[in-house]
């Protein structure tokens, strides 16, 4: 399963995504910002409300070098969520082989892509619940987004 956009992302980010330099370049930027929240919380939506069609099956150019980093964040979040001790090398190796596929364009297995989609869905729910509302400027969005990180609101 390639990346699939949580349904709420498209409408939430529609006013701050586009070709203008004052906007997010792609919807993947919004997807990634949502996924970071879910990953940091170590929480996902198992019944994620995702768009039916594929969003992407690769990383956009700006993220091309970040695939290993994103895979690492996913592995760390899943290890924490599954309570795998950091000194349990066998369990961590098994988890990595379940989530990573080196030949995949995303460097993630189908299971890994599905989990990242679920973390992103959790992230958009948190944004909608805890930020001050839908933003019409990227600057206002980032101010609110980073304030939520700095104050720990996203991690509650």
Say what each PLM segment does:
Residues 2-29, 49-62, 76-78:
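Surface-exposed, Lys/Arg-rich phosphate-binding patches that contact polyanionic backbones
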Residues 27-30, 35, 66-70, 92-96, ...:
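Short runs of predominantly hydrophobic/aromatic residues within well-ordered alpha helices
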Residues 78-132:
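Amphipathic protein-protein interaction modules
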Residues 1, 95, 155-156:
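Domain-scale detector for complete catalytic domains at protein termini or as standalone homologs
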Residues 25-49:
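Short, basic amphipathic alpha-helical segments that act as recognition/interaction helices
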Residues 56-91:
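Long, intrinsically disordered, low-complexity Ser/Thr/Pro-rich regulatory/activation regions
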Residues 114-156:
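Glycine-rich, aromatic-bearing surface loops/beta-hairpins
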């Amino acid at each position: 399963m390639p990346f699939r956009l949580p349904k709420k992302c498209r409408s939430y980010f529609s006013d701050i995504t586009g070709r203008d330099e004052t906007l997010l370049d792609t919807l993947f930027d919004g997807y990634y910002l949502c996924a970071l929240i879910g990953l940091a919380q170590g929480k996902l939506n198992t019944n994620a409300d995702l768009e039916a069609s594929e969003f992407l099956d690769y990383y956009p150019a700006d993220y091309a070098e970040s695939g290993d980093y994103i895979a690492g964040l996913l592995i760390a979040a899943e290890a924490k969520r599954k309570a795998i001790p950091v000194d349990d090398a066998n369990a961590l190796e098994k988890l990595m082989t379940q989530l990573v596929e080196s030949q995949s364009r995303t460097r993630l297995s189908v299971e890994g892509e599905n989990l990242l989609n679920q973390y992103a869905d959790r992230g958009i729910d948190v944004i909608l619940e805890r930020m001050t509302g839908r933003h019409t400027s990227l600057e206002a969005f980032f101010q609110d987004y980073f304030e939520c990180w700095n104050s720990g609101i996203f991690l509650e």
